[in-house]
A protein has these predicted regions:
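Non-transmembrane, aqueous-exposed alpha-helical and coiled segments at domain scale
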Residues: 1-192, 197-291
Length: 291
């Protein structure tokens, strides 16, 4: 199956706009679950406002949030897919620029030193593009995640040592959620990366934060720790928008990697309540959009 750059460009454009407008079904279901279980009156009111915002965005074909975020594209290439990797990256950038200028969208991307905004949602190394491979035949998947600054500004890394054990990981994650408070626009998805090197650990935390609700860590011990941490975080009383309540997080997600015998890095990356993402899947039958 051959994929032309123009197809990727159009998908990149469409995905950015879709991600900013339509919340995935698993996040909507997460809101319904929290709204049903929340016992604090103020928190329940805040959740109601968030749910109403989702409805208004859908009914009026508007954005879910004013923050268009840092555009992240995760590309997964299956077997028997023919494409030009360099051309694909350029096509994604063009699609991102077109979405920003044609819609138009607010560009949130600036030069890190001069703070100059090119009004394209693009810049040095942005959009962020990750490319990986899968065993699926004749399939190309492109996931788009617009990562907002409230959640991204509250990212943490600790180079723990093995002697501190799992309890140190739990304490660190809980402390990070407390430190973030309402700045991440909770309820959040708390992504936790454990193991690897510092850079891999942070990447794992981001991957965990953008996983669909209801998914579990593939490792049985990791999945058990997810459940314990989710319970611990939701006992903190941070609540929606940091105003108190039971609903601090939709879930805690964990991704693991093997690490050095003298290391045990742990990273936290959170996703705000507007946990936006969109996906395009190319097959011989065409392109299908979803989440």
């Amino acid at each position: 199956m051959k994929i032309e750059p123009v197809q990727v460009e159009e998908a990149a454009r469409e995905l950015y706009i879709r991600a900013l407008k339509m919340l995935p079904p698993d996040i909507k279901a997460g809101f319904a679950r929290l709204d049903k279980s929340e016992t604090d009156a103020t928190a329940k009111s805040v959740l109601g406002t968030m749910i109403a915002n989702i409805r208004v965005a859908e009914d009026t074909d508007n954005l879910l949030c004013q923050d268009t975020g840092i555009p992240i594209y995760n590309v997964l290439i299956g077997r028997d897919v023919e494409l030009d990797g360099h051309a694909i990256k350029a096509a994604i950038r063009r699609g991102c620029e077109r979405a920003t200028r044609d819609y138009p969208l607010r560009s949130s991307v600036v030069h890190p030193l001069t703070r100059r905004n090119e009004h394209s949602s693009c810049g040095i190394e942005v959009p962020v593009i990750h490319i990986d491979f899968s065993d699926l035949p004749e399939t190309l998947s492109i996931e788009m995640v617009p990562k907002g600054s409230g959640s991204e500004n509250n990212s943490f890394l600790r180079m723990a040592i093995p002697a501190e054990g799992v309890d140190a990981i739990k304490t660190f994650v809980v402390d990070c959620v407390i430190a973030a408070g309402g700045k991440t626009c909770p309820p959040t998805i708390v992504g936790v990366g454990i193991g690897g090197t510092s850079d891999l650990c942070i990447a794992l935390a981001k991957r965990a934060a953008t996983r669909p609700l209801g998914s579990r860590c593939a490792d049985v011990d990791g999945a058990a720790l997810e459940a314990r941490l989710s319970a611990a975080v939701n006992q903190l009383g941070v609540g929606p928008q940091g105003l108190g309540g039971d609903s601090t997080a939709f879930a805690v997600h964990i991704e693991l990697a093997a690490t050095h015998i003298t290391m045990n890095p742990v990273a936290v990356n959170m996703q705000c309540h507007s946990a936006r993402r969109a996906r395009a899947t190319f097959t011989p039958a065409g392109v299908a959009y979803g989440f």
